[in-house]
């Protein structure tokens, strides 16, 4: 399974291994995002991102400084970091590296139930790269609670990317608003755990599907794991059945998938 290409597509906003290479971010990442108009907040909320001084990553490459993310209620209000700062995660409990965010990969408003429904704030951040080029990428989704005039985290997940892991928010199509994750299995035949979370009526994400992939690690498929598994995902959720047109993602190089086909239940682009 080849690495996915690009951070965003027209159908999905994805955590992309190719977008997370150990390079210095080309432009300063400090920014502010006005949330008042898009969320119709009672107070003038905004997302604030502050970038620290440049550092070296764990491969001794130049890297951007640590990011401080917070939500500020007006220009003079306190900046609250807890709602947008997930707990730090290391590969193992005894691992010394702190995986604080250094790369702002995505900060935008998304519409899981269409443009006329309530939006969510999507944040994707990446840690420093380790010596082997791996990186912890954290994905968060937040909604706005008008009754309490505050933002709350409704989804949080982090993973690496060296083994084709991915966390993807689906922006449109039959799975619109879902979050799909692909993470490698630790034992033969070395496929992936595919997990689908959907937004419930209560406003929180809940798991609706988990299964072992038909896709295998290093199988030569140019598609991202989630794309190659899309027929299986949609079939198990009752959104697609054999005989209907196959889902047609990009072919892995930004070009349309002209001839989608199934091989051992996984989607390939010929």
Where are these regions (language model features)?
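Short N-terminal edge-element motif at the start of the domain
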Residues: 71-117
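Extracellular-facing segments of soluble proteins and assemblies that are Gly/Ser/Thr-biased and enriched
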Residues: 100-150
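Acidic, small-residue rich beta-repeat scaffolds with periodic aromatic anchors
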Residues: 14-46, 50-64, 70, 165-270
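His-enriched metal-coordination microenvironments in redox/metal-binding proteins
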Residues: 127-137, 158-163, 185-191
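Short helix-loop boundary/capping segments
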Residues: 135-136, 140-179
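Surface-exposed loop/turn elements that mediate protein-protein interactions on large endomembrane-trafficking
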Residues: 69-90, 140-157, 196-209
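Bacterial N-terminal signal peptides
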Residues: 1-9
């Amino acid at each position: 399974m080849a690495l996915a290409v690009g951070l965003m597509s027209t159908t999905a906003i994805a955590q992309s291994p190719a977008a997370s290479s150990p390079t210095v971010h080309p432009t300063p990442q400090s920014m502010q995002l006005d949330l008042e108009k898009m969320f119709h907040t009672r107070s003038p909320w905004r997302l604030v991102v502050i970038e620290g001084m440049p550092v070296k990553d764990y491969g001794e490459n130049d890297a951007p400084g640590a990011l401080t993310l917070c939500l500020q209620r007006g220009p003079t209000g306190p900046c609250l970091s807890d709602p947008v700062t997930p707990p730090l995660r290391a590969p193992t409990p005894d691992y010394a590296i702190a995986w604080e965010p250094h790369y702002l990969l995505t900060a935008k408003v998304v519409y899981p139930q269409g443009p006329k429904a309530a939006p969510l704030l999507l944040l994707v951040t990446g840690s420093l790269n380790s010596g082997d080029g791996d990186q912890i990428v954290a994905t968060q989704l937040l909604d706005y609670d008008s009754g309490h005039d505050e933002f709350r985290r409704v989804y949080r997940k982090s993973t690496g990317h060296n083994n084709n892991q991915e966390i993807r928010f689906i922006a449109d199509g039959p799975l619109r608003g879902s979050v799909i994750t692909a993470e490698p299995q630790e034992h033969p035949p070395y496929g992936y755990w595919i997990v689908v979370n959907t937004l419930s009526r209560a406003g929180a994400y809940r798991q609706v599907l988990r299964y072992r992939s038909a896709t295998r690690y290093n199988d030569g498929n140019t598609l991202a794991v989630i794309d190659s598994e899309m027929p299986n995902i949609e079939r198990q959720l009752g959104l697609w059945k054999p005989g209907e047109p196959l889902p047609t993602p990009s072919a892995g190089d930004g070009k349309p998938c002209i001839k989608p086909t199934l091989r051992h239940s996984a989607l390939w682009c010929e």
